[in-house]
């Protein structure tokens, strides 16, 4: 399971639960993103990962802990469809969500990002673990 596939599974899980918001991957040029949606947006992106240690002398197999961040962009803080409500609902929808080949999504951090001209931005980060396995090719070079 690669990063893009996991990101897409998260987006597809959110869409039916947030039909009143724009749900998509984080923009390629975030500095150019303008909230045009009348209510708000949820923007999903891969934040990074860490690999477990290995003492393997032969075949390498590790766990990769991956963090995915969801940026919530809303026009309200507390009222209907405000940042607080969206944060709570995202946690409810994604906590325990299992993507095939990965561990369940677990929330690890959330917080305030910014407020500019009444547009509120918060972020919630989820983590999961996926296997990272050496790609064995026949006839590979043996440096041994």
Task: Please place each PLM-identified region on the residue numbering.
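Generic marker of residues within folded, mature protein domains
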Residues: 34, 60, 114-116
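Acidic-leaning, charged glycine-interspersed low-complexity segments
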Residues: 16, 38-43, 84-137
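Residue-level signal for secondary-structure boundary sites
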Residues: 52, 76-78, 132-136
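Small/polar-rich, solvent-exposed N-terminal microdomains that initiate assembly or binding
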Residues: 1-58, 80, 85, 140-144
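Extracellular/virion structural assembly segments
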Residues: 59-65, 73-95
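Oligomerization/assembly interface segments of phage tail-like spikes and tubes
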Residues: 60-76, 120-132
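Residue-level marker of positions within ordered structural domains that often coincide
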Residues: 19, 49, 75, 95, ...
């Amino acid at each position: 399971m690669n990063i893009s596939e996991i990101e897409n599974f998260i987006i597809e899980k959110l869409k039916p639960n947030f039909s009143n918001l724009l749900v998509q991957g984080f923009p390629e040029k975030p500095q150019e993103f303008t909230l045009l949606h009348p209510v708000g947006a949820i923007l999903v992106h891969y934040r990074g990962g860490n690999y477990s240690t290995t003492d393997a002398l032969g075949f390498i197999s590790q766990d990769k802990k991956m963090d995915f961040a969801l940026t919530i962009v809303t026009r309200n803080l507390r009222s209907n469809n405000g940042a607080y409500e969206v944060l709570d609902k995202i946690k409810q929808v994604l906590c325990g969500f299992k993507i095939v080949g990965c561990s369940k999504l677990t929330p690890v951090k959330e917080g305030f990002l910014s407020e500019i001209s009444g547009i509120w931005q918060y972020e919630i980060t989820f983590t999961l673990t996926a296997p990272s396995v050496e790609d064995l090719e026949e006839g590979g070079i043996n440096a041994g």
